[in-house]
């Protein structure tokens, strides 16, 4: 019980997770800056090399290699080892593969490899250069997980693997994404930096201008590459290599021969085909994957009159034909994860190779000196051969012979051992010459090795020579094309939309849809799908290339391209705006709908209950970035109770404003200033404290009507309201009563020509064209009344009009609209 310690769970968890984080950072996910390998990759290469599973020998079952690696060096799941081995064999993931594999090792389509019991593997030839000289005490070794064997903590790496093959991985708090590069270019940059240790980044980039992906493609953005090489972080555009191919009959097809690095080809083809299926861009007939053993090929066949460049631009922008590659060059440097630039990577590699060459030279020198000592002894033996033979024959045994040689002729222990084990056939004249030549060679070698160890310039010359040998043997052309500037993809969205005729309908409650002419013509107008408590306020024929603007009572405007509206049957209710517009309020209603071809020209006038008025330009309503999810303001309301009464296009006529208490004011529309969307406007009419605006409309006829809440209706001449100025009180159009006073419910122009466009929202039902302008009134008890407005006689300005029925005064008006 004395070993029990009381510790807080917080401290224990923090300390243990810290250990775990350090382990996975250093021992799992991040590469070493010197050899560019993660621990599992290093163990795979070392174990296969140790077992003799190298390129000059036959292939060996992958399962055997995986078992040896797992049993001796990597005590984790066999799948993690096999997956790492497979990745090192995939030529679309690595610029230079380190493992050669027979059998199915996966594909660019994301297909899994065959099980390890079916595949065979061996080290590639270039992988041998990563392990070169490892037996010469060139790198530190550490005990394996069970202290039964030692493994290298880094490989000698005769070429800069970190840059050549790149790396990617995620650990606790760190991630790395280092792109692959061209072997020749990397070696050229290393050689230049050996000669110029303080070389500028600009100069190094003359030799190493950018990444070189195994899948090719086009890399755009020289400035971002420079930034990444300087700081370790940056982002470049990687674009597929494409060409337009002519077909018979004047048709074309887009051919893709190279795709961005680490893009799944099958998923890419599926996404391109989804564009075709969903008709997101018209003109694609078929998408085919024609890849075979000769190379990658994706064919996108187009219709005869299709705009191939526009379609290609769309696919580049909205599929993985073009992607962004994010540099995040993090590597383990002196047991610490660091974000490193190009100069740091190259200098760390040069420093590592310096240590390797010096340690190798020391090892070779010691070996040469040991051999020279033996050779010197053997040459001396041959000069006194008869005496030596006699001495050996007189000795009792091998040990006695060795002792006699050391005492009588002053041979060392090593020389004595070599003499007594010397085979008789070597005691010939030819062997003497051979030994003398070997002695000379050994002395020259020792001199050379001493120079390498003692003279830095000589050592660097060796380093450069060895790098150039690797380049000469394994150099291959650059696969990725570099372009200095990232091209901005411009898409003519109008050309992407198939122009079709359609009918657009909008209800006051916010339901909208588009309907094909076939469905619309197959039904009557009354059969429109809507809620019982809703009202259809807009139906109009339009083209899918046009735009819909919806203005609400709360001063918001909603934009929708016609082609984005849900295509439904005429009898369907439609899509409610709250499904997509996050700020569409429960009490908000659609006041006015307008279909426009462009936003270049046009003015609107908005009038609020508080009597404020403004004009604003349609240009300001051009689509905003978040139009799919949010509306934007077209007028600022004075308070929470304020509402927009009228919104309509502006014509160069007078405006007539009528208040609930019966005041009417007429003034020129030119008096209303054009203001920005967020302004509240200017005072249109001078309201009394208990009054508010009921209606506003443009004066386009000689008369107008006034309907009160009690159901009284009259028609009066526009001239009875003479033109004055904005912000006045106006004239009364009702006679004040002490009991049951009349209040204006609705007012509007009476059109003598019913085909003329009406600019009051409440009278704007363009879908119904009748011979007469009708006023429909629904009472609170559900009674419906229809009155032909032109049949009404003109009344005096101060009269209260006539009731539309004997009982309407008691029922009162619930809804009124013109059609």
UniProtKB/Swiss-Prot annotation:
Quick one: a GO biological-process term for this protein? DNA topological change
Annotated InterPro entries? GyrA/parC_rep (IPR006691), Gyrase/topoIV_suA_C (IPR035516), Topo_IIA-like_dom_sf (IPR013760), Topo_IIA_A/C_ab (IPR013758), Topo_IIA_A_a_sf (IPR013757), Topo_IIA_dom_A (IPR002205), TopoIV_A_Gpos (IPR005741), Type_II_DNA_Topoisomerases (IPR050220)
List the residues marked with site Interaction with DNA.
38, 74, 76, 87, 93
Query: Where does the record place a coiled coil?
Result: none
Membrane topology is: Peripheral membrane protein
Q: Which CDD domains match?
A: TOP4c (cd00187)
Q: Which residues form the signal peptide?
A: none
- Give the first-level EC class, as a single word: isomerase
A Pfam match: DNA_gyraseA_C
What does the UniProt function comment say about this protein? Topoisomerase IV is essential for chromosome segregation. It relaxes supercoiled DNA. Performs the decatenation events required during the replication of a circular DNA molecule.
Protein name as annotated: DNA topoisomerase 4 subunit A
Q: Which organism is it from?
A: Streptococcus pyogenes serotype M18 (strain MGAS8232)
Instruction: Name the gene that codes for it.
Output: parC
């Amino acid at each position: 019980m004395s070993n029990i310690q009381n510790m807080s769970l917080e401290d224990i968890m923090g300390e243990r997770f810290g250990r775990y984080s350090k382990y996975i950072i250093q021992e799992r996910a991040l590469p070493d800056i010197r050899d560019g390998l993660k621990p599992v990759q290093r163990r795979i290469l070392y174990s296969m090399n140790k077992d003799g599973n190298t390129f000059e020998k036959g292939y060996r079952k992958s399962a055997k290699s995986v078992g040896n690696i797992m049993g001796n060096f990597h005590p984790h799941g066999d799948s993690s080892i096999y997956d790492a081995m497979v990745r090192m064999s995939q030529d679309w993931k690595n610029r230079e593969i380190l493992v050669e594999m027979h059998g199915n090792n996966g594909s660019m389509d994301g297909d899994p490899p065959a099980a390890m019991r079916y595949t065979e593997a061996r080290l590639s030839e270039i992988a041998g250069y990563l392990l070169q000289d490892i037996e010469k005490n060139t790198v530190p070794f550490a005990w394996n997980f069970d202290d039964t064997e030692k493994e290298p903590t880094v490989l000698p790496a005769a070429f800069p693997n970190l840059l050549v093959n790149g790396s990617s991985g995620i650990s606790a708090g760190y991630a790395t994404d280092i792109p692959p590069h061209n072997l020749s270019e990397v070696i050229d940059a290393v050689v230049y930096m050996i000669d110029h240790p303080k070389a500028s980044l600009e100069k190094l980039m003359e030799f190493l201008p950018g990444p070189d992906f195994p899948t090719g493609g086009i890399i755009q953005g020289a400035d971002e590459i420079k930034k990444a090489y300087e700081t370790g972080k940056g982002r470049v555009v990687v674009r597929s290599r494409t060409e337009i191919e002519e077909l018979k009959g004047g048709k074309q097809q887009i051919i893709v021969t190279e795709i961005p690095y680490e893009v799944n080809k099958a998923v890419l083809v599926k996404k391109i085909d989804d564009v075709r299926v969903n008709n997101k861009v018209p003109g694609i007939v078929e998408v085919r994957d024609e890849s075979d053993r000769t190379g990658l090929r994706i064919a996108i066949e187009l219709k005869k009159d299709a705009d191939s460049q526009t379609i290609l631009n769309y696919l580049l922008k909205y599929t993985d034909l073009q992607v962004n590659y994010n540099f995040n060059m993090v590597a383990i440097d002196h047991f610490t994860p660091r974000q490193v630039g190009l100069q740091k990577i190259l200098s760390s590699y040069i420093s590592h190779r310096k240590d390797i060459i010096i340690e190798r030279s020391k090892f070779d020198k010691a070996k040469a000196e040991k051999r020279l000592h033996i050779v010197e002894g053997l040459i001396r033996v041959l000069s006194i051969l008869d005496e030596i033979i006699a001495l050996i024959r007189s000795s009792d045994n091998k040990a006695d012979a060795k002792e006699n040689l050391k005492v009588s002729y002053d041979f060392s222990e090593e020389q004595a051992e070599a003499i007594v084990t010397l085979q008789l056939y070597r005691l010939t004249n030819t062997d003497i010459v051979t030994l003398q030549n070997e002695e000379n060679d050994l002395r020259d070698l020792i001199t050379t090795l001493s120079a390498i160890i003692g003279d830095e310039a000589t050592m660097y010359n060796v380093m450069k020579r060895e790098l150039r040998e690797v380049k000469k043997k394994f150099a291959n052309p650059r696969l990725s094309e570099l372009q200095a500037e990232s091209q901005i993809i411009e898409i003519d969205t109008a050309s992407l939309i198939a122009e079709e005729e359609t009918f657009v309908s909008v209800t006051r409650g916010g339901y909208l849809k588009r309907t094909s002419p076939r469905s619309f013509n197959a039904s009557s107008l009354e059969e429109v799908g809507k809620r019982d408590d809703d009202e259809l306020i807009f139906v109009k024929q339009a083209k899918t290339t046009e735009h819909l603007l919806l203005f609400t009572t709360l001063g918001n405007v909603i934009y929708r391209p016609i082609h984005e509206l849900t295509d439904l049957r005429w009898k369907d209710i439609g899509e409610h705006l709250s499904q997509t517009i996050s700020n569409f309020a429960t009490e908000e209603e659609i006041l006015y709908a307008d279909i426009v071809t462009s936003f270049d020209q046009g003015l609107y006038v908005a009038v609020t209950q508080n009597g404020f008025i403004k004009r604003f330009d349609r240009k300001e309503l051009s689509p905003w970035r978040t139009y799919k999810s949010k509306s934007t303001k077209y007028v600022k309301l004075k308070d929470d109770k304020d509402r927009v009464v009228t919104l309509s296009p502006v014509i160069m006529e007078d405006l007539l404003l009528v208040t609930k208490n019966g005041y009417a004011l007429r003034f020129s529309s030119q008096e209303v200033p054009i203001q920005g969307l967020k302004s509240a406007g200017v005072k249109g009419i001078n309201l009394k404290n208990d009054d508010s605006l009921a209606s506003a409309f443009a004066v386009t006829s000689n008369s107008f009507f006034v309907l009160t809440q009690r159901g009284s209706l009259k028609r009066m001449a526009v001239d009875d309201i003479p033109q004055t100025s904005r912000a006045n009180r106006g004239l009364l159009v009702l006679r004040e009563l002490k009991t049951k006073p009349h209040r204006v419910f609705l007012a509007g122009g009476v059109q003598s020509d019913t085909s003329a466009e009406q600019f009051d929202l409440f009278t704007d039902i363009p879908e119904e064209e009748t011979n007469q302008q009708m006023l429909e009134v629904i009472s609170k008890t559900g009674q419906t009344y229809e009155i032909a407005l032109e049949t009404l006689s003109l009344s005096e300005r101060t009269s209260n009009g006539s009731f539309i029925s004997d009982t309407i005064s008691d029922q009162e008006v619930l809804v009124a609209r013109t059609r």
